[in-house]
Design a protein with these regions (language model features):
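N-terminal beta-propeller domains
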Residues: 1-85, 133-195, 199-201, 205-206, ...
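Beta-sheet-dominated scaffold domains
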Residues: 2-9, 13, 101, 105-106, ...
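A short beta-strand motif characteristic of beta-propeller blades
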Residues: 45-51, 84-90, 122-128, 166-173, ...
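Short loop/turn positions that demarcate and connect the beta-strands within blades
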Residues: 54, 92-94, 129-132, 175-178, ...
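Glycine-centered tight turns/hairpins at beta-strand boundaries that repeat
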Residues: 72, 110-112, 149, 233, ...
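Short, surface-exposed terminal/edge motifs of secreted or surface/virion proteins that either
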Residues: 72-80, 114-124, 156-158, 240, ...
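A broadly used, surface-exposed interaction patch
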Residues: 79-109
Length: 339
């Protein structure tokens, strides 16, 4: 009888059921010989590439051969040598949330009631009075898409211009009563996440308002943490919530929510005091696509390997000696490096 000694993070409440903790190691299996052809590899470490600002890195994006990074309230550009230059300042509210998106011409940052246009050399406040505030932004077919906080309404910028708005360019996600808490564009479709449901919209080309709801594309699962939404492996991942509870991790299988968390991780998430502050990013390395889900309040980081189908094997945790959780808040691939 072969005893499987290698696996993922699947610790249960009862160690008699499962006691396995896979920490800073990820599993790689041979599909031809899954029982004998498995190995655990160490998660690569981190080295300093650039030193900017005094606060945590809140967001990063690659744009026009530079990285634009937000450190506390400072905006920096970073070049391929790691040299960082402060190019401006933004105003953060109490949540200190920042979201970035970009078109060919510029990056836009939103912080709640404020928005900023960022180039490689300047930061300019958006002054158009029709900007209605947002913590969320993404790019679709020339438009930036935003969601009005604490509402079901979303709106778009002028085409190819994140500083210009029309008060009539808005719509409402109304298939359910939940407010929009997250949004992401995937395969040229706009996914609007509520706390209990998801609506999917697309560019219909209509002249009055270009976006329209996709018929029948409503998911009865919402989002528990807006910053847990991340694209990877040709799909979307997020920490879920619906009318019956919360704390399951999902990936989209076309328009179907597929649970990818295992019972051990779901139990641990359920014991956390505030999962709404969870953050996530995704990256690909050595043939593995990793979804990195962190809970800053509880100092925990869980990582899902999309190359493994079995949730009992696909997860591991990452820990840092000084912090408990993984140190990374966000990620961008630039200059041939994972930053």
């Amino acid at each position: 009888m072969k005893i499987p000694l290698l696996g993922g993070y699947s610790k249960r409440r009862s160690v008699n059921q499962d006691a396995q903790r896979t920490v800073n190691l990820y599993l790689e299996t041979d599909t031809a010989e899954p029982e004998s052809g498995s190995a655990l590899y160490m998660v690569p470490g981190k080295t300093e590439f650039a030193a900017i600002g005094n606060g945590p890195i809140r967001a990063m994006i690659s744009h026009n051969h530079l990285v634009i990074a937000i450190s506390e309230n400072g905006v920096y550009r970073i070049n391929e040598t790691g040299a960082g230059t402060r190019i401006g300042t933004i105003t953060l509210d109490g949540t200190k949330r920042v979201a970035l998106s970009a078109n060919r011409n510029h990056v836009i940052a939103v912080t709640g009631q404020n928005a900023y246009i960022i180039t490689g050399s300047s930061v300019t406040s958006v002054t158009d009075t029709d900007f209605a505030g947002s913590y969320l932004v993404d790019y679709l077919d020339g438009y930036f898409v935003f969601a009005i906080p604490d509402s079901q309404q979303f709106y778009i910028s002028a085409i190819n211009d994140g500083s210009s708005f029309d008060a009539l360019d808005f719509a409402q996600a109304e298939s359910n009563l939940d407010d929009i808490v997250g949004l992401v564009v995937d395969h040229r479709e706009l996914w609007l996440f509520g706390s209990k449901s998801i609506e999917i919209w697309y560019n219909s080309g209509a002249t009055d308002f270009p976006l329209a709801r996709r018929d029948g594309a409503v998911l009865e699962v919402g989002c528990a943490a807006p910053q847990s939404i991340s694209k990877a492996d040709n799909t979307i991942f997020w920490l879920g919530r619906n009318a019956h509870g919360q704390g399951l991790v999902y990936r989209a299988d076309q328009y179907n929510p597929q649970i990818i968390s295992n019972r051990g991780i779901e139990y641990e998430i359920g014991q956390m005091p505030d999962i709404g502050k969870a953050t996530a990013f995704a990256y690909q390395q050595s043939g593995h696509t990793f979804y990195v889900l962190s809970f800053p309040e509880s100092m925990r980081t869980y990582v899902y390997d999309a190359s493994i189908q079995d949730p009992e094997l696909a997860w591991h945790v990452r820990e840092t000696y000084a912090q408990g959780r993984d140190r990374a808040n966000c990620h961008v691939f630039a200059f041939g490096k994972h930053l």
